[in-house]
Amino acid sequence: MTESPTTSPATGSGAAAPDSDAPPYRYTAALAGRIEGSWQDTWAKLGTFNVPNPVGSLAPTDGTPVPEDKLFVQDMFPYPSGEGLHVGHPLGYIATDVYARYFRMTGRNVLHALGFDAFGLPAEQYAVQTGTHPRTRTEANVVNFRRQLGRLGLGHDSRRSFSTTDVEFYKWTQWIFLQIYNAWFDPAANKARPIAELVAEFDSGARSLDDGRNWSELSAGERADVIDSHRLVYRADSMVNWCPGLGTVLANEEVTADGRSDRGNFPVFRKRLRQWMMRITAYSDRLLDDLDLLDWPEPVKTMQRNWIGRSTGAKALFAATGADGAALDIEVFTTRPDTLFGATYMVLAPEHELVDELVAPAWPDGTDPRWTYGAATPGESVAAYRRAIASKSDLERQESKAKTGVFLGSYATNPTNGKPVPIFIADYVLAGYGTGAIMAVPGHDQRDWDFAHEFGLPIVEVIAGGDISEGAYAGDGVLVNSGYLDGLDVAAAKEAITARLEAEGRGCARVEYKLRDWLFARQRYWGEPFPIVYDSDGRPHALDEAALPVELPDVPDYSPVLFDPDDADSEPSPPLAKATDWVHVELDLGDGLKPYSRDTNVMPQWAGSSWYELRYTDPHNSERFCAKENEAYWMGPRPAEHGPQDPGGVDLYVGGAEHAVLHLLYARFWHKVLYDLGHVSSREPYRRLVNQGYIQAFAYTDSRGSYVPAEEVVERDGRFFYRGPDGEIEVFQEFGKIGKSLKNSISPDEICDDYGADTLRVYEMSMGPLEASRPWATKDVVGAHRFLQRVWRLVVDEQTGETRVVDGAGRDLPTGTLRLLHRTIAGVSEDYAALRNNTAVAKLIEYTNHLTKEHRDAVPRAAVEPLVLMLAPLAPHMAEELWLRLGHTTSLAHGPFPVADPAYLVEDTVEYPVQVNGKVRGRVTVAADADRDTLEAAALADEKVLAFLAGAQPRKVIVVPGRLVNLVV
C-alpha cells in the first residue's frame, strides 16, 4: 500500500480554505492534491484497474479462468484538441467511472478504458499553418489529455489505451476495410458473404448475370467489373458535397442546414465525382429492425429510424423519348400509387442521370414562358438553373417556399391513362432520395400544387373530399377521375393499381429508403490511407493483408489544394498526390511485378470509431484485430442475462446524442458486416446507450453578437462589462454549452487546483440527472468541497491528524443510525446501478449530516466505514485515504461494497394523513401492521381531527391501506 500523505499538516490552504488559521489537518485543496497524486501513483504501480482477458497477452499468467460476471463500460472517446479539456468534457467520463467503480466493488470483472479519436482536420490545419507534422501536434495533445484525465482519478486500464493514429491500430482499420471490400451482400441470405463465394457461384453456373450475358464468355476485365459492382465497397460517379474552401468532399452529415461546411463555414456545392462508397443501404432493414433489440434512448432510435427512412409504395415507369429519338423509361417511386391518374407533370432532380438525354434541342411550339427560365433553348435554361442552385443544401432545397424549375422541352407518358406529361427539373426533388424523379400530383400534394400553381400546370382531383382549387387535399376518400379505380378507397386503390402495373410490366411494389450509401473518402492527409492500388488501366486492386499497414508518407506540405470558397467548378487534389515516390510503386499482386499507383484519398474520421470498441478487448494482439475468445467474453450475447434476443455488445456506452446518425450508425454497419463474415459473435456493437447532457455556462456577446472571453467580464449593478482593445464596453449575458466557440471554457485543472479532483467529481455528479443539461457555477463547487470536509472530519481529527473513530459491533449502533445506514446503502446501491449519481450524492450528504449531528465526539467504526465504502465510486482518492487511516492494508477499489440488511429497511410505523370530507385535517402515526380498527380509532382520537369534527360523528370511514384515512361527515 501507500504511506499516508496526511501524516504531515495540510500546509498551503488552497482556494477552498483561504483562512490561514485553519486547523493543520483540515481537508484543503493542497491536502487533496497530495492525496490524489499519491493514490494515482499507487493505482498505477499496482495495476489496480488492470483487467484480465480469457486469452492473449492480457490473460492471467497462471492460467486462472476469468470471472464469468464481467462488465464492459465504454465512453465515446475524445478528439485530442489543442485546447485541452474543459469542465464539460469529464461529465460522462466521471459518470462511467462511478458506475464501473461501483460494480468493480461488487465483485464484477470490469473493463473500462479510454483511447483517442486522433485523426481529423484540426491537426491537419495546424500542420498546414506551421509546417509541423500532424502527428507531432496530435501526440502532444494526447499527452496533455492523458495528464488532465489522469488528475480526475479515472479507473481505466491504461494498458488498453490507444489512438486511432497509432500505426498498429489503423493497420486493423485498413484490414477491416479490406474485409468489407472483399464482401458482397446476398439479399437471399440477408447477410454479407465473401466475394470469393460470389465468384465461385458465377464460375459454377449457380448464379446468372442479371443482364443475361454469359459469365464464361466475359473477359477478365468484364468479370472484374461485374464483381466490383457487387462489392460492399465500390467506386461510383456520384453527387457529392464539394467544399472548395476545405479542398475536400464532405459527407451529408458534415454539411449544415444552410449549405455550408460544419467546420470552417465554407460554401458547399453539389458536384459529380468518382468516389469510394460503402454500401450501407444493403443493411437498411437490419439496421432498422435491430433497433428494437437495443437498450437505447428512444429519441436516438427515432433519429436513426428517420435517417434510414423506410417507405412502402410502388415503382412506376413513365415512357419518354430522348433528344436522339431513343426510347427511355423514367422510373419513379411513390408511396401513393393510388393517385397516378392525377399525375399531370413530372419533376426530375437537376442532377438526375437522364436529364441531359431528355433536354430537347428547342422549345416546343406554345411553350409557356414561365417554363423557360428566360432562356432561348432548353439546354441553356438547364445549365443556368443548375448554376443557380449549385450552392443550396438539400434542406434548403426542400424547405424553400418559392418554387422554381425548368421545362426540359420533352414529355413522358402517364402509364395509367396514356396522357403526355411535361418533364421539369426542380430543386425540391433530390437525386439522393428514391429514384430522383417524381410523378407530380398537384391535386393531392401541396408542394406539387404550389409548383403547378406557379407554372400554370393542370390540377386534377382523383380523391374526393377536398377543394383542390384552394390547395391540395391529402385526406382519405374514394377515387374519382381514375378509370377502373373509381369508387375504391385509398387502400384498395393502391393494391389494385400496383397489381395492374406489375401485370403490364410498368411497375411493381417497392420499399425505398432515405438512407444513402456512405461516402468513404476524403481529400486530406491526416487519415488512414486506403489499402488500394490502381493498375495502368485505372482498375482498383486490394492489397494483400500481408502488405498492411499502409503507412502515411511524409509530404512536402499537408494541405489539399484549397480553392476560392465560391469556385464550384474546382476539382479535388489530395495532399498525398504530392508524395510521388509513395504513390508510384511496383508490386507483384499474383501476376508478376507491375507498376501501380496508390489511392491518394484517405478514410474519413469515422473509420477508427466504427470499430474501436473491439480493440479495447484485445489491444496488443498483432495477429488479429481481436481474438474471438476475448470478443465473445466481453461482448458476446448473454441470453440468460439479457433475454433470448440479446444481440450482445458493450454493456454500457455513454456519449453525446449528436452522434446518433453518424458514428453510431456507421459503427453498427461495420459491426454487422464483421458478424456476417464470422469475425465477431455479437450482432451489435453497443447493447446499452446513455446520452449525457451538457454542462452549460454563461457566455457574453458584444453589440455585434461576437463572443468575448467570459473570464474577463465583470458585473456591476446587474450589468456586464468587458475591457477590450478599444476600452470598456457593455456586453450581454446568455446561456449556452461550454466550449471554445462561446469563449466560456473553464479548465478542470483550475478546479482541481482550487478544490481537488474529488470535489470536481462530486460537484459534477451532484448537478443533476446525467441525461439532463445543467448550469455550471464555480461558486457552487465549494458546497461539494464542504461535504467532503465533513466526511473527512468524521474520521480525522483536524487538529492532530489522528483517527477519531471508536470500535464496536454494528448492532450496537443506535436504532436511528442503523436504519438510516441501511436505507442509505440500499438507496445508493440502486442509484449507482442506475446512473443516478446526483441522488446518490444527496443520500450520502444526508447520512453524513446525521453522523455529524448524532456522533459529535467520535463516530462508531461500524457507521463510518460503510460511508467511506459508499463514497469510494464518487470520491475515490479520499475514500482510499480514509480506508487506509481506518487500518485497512488493501485498496477498497475491489470492494467490498456494503450490503443493506432488509430487516432495517422495513418501517415499524407509518404516518397516515387524516382527511375530513377529502381535505387533510390531521396526521396519525400507527404501527406498520396496524389493522383497520386500530387505524380508525387513532384517526378519531386525534386532537386536530376532533376539534374540526366539533362533536359530529362520521357517516362513513374510508381507509386506504398505506395511504390515508378519510372521514365523511
From Swiss-Prot:
It catalyses: tRNA(Leu) + L-leucine + ATP = L-leucyl-tRNA(Leu) + AMP + diphosphate. GO terms for cellular component: cytosol. Gene3D superfamilies: HUPs, Isoleucyl-tRNA Synthetase, Domain 1, Valyl/Leucyl/Isoleucyl-tRNA synthetase, editing domain. A motif ('KMSKS' region) lies at residues 737-741. ATP binds at K740. SUPFAM superfamilies: Anticodon-binding domain of a subclass of class I aminoacyl-tRNA synthetases, Nucleotidylyl transferase, ValRS/IleRS/LeuRS editing domain. Its EC number is 6.1.1.4. GO terms for molecular function: aminoacyl-tRNA deacylase activity; ATP binding; leucine-tRNA ligase activity. It is an enzyme of class 6 (ligase). Keywords: Aminoacyl-tRNA synthetase, ATP-binding, Cytoplasm, Ligase, Nucleotide-binding, Protein biosynthesis. NCBIfam families: leuS_bact (TIGR00396). This is Leucine--tRNA ligase. It comes from Mycolicibacterium paratuberculosis (strain ATCC BAA-968 / K-10) (Mycobacterium paratuberculosis).
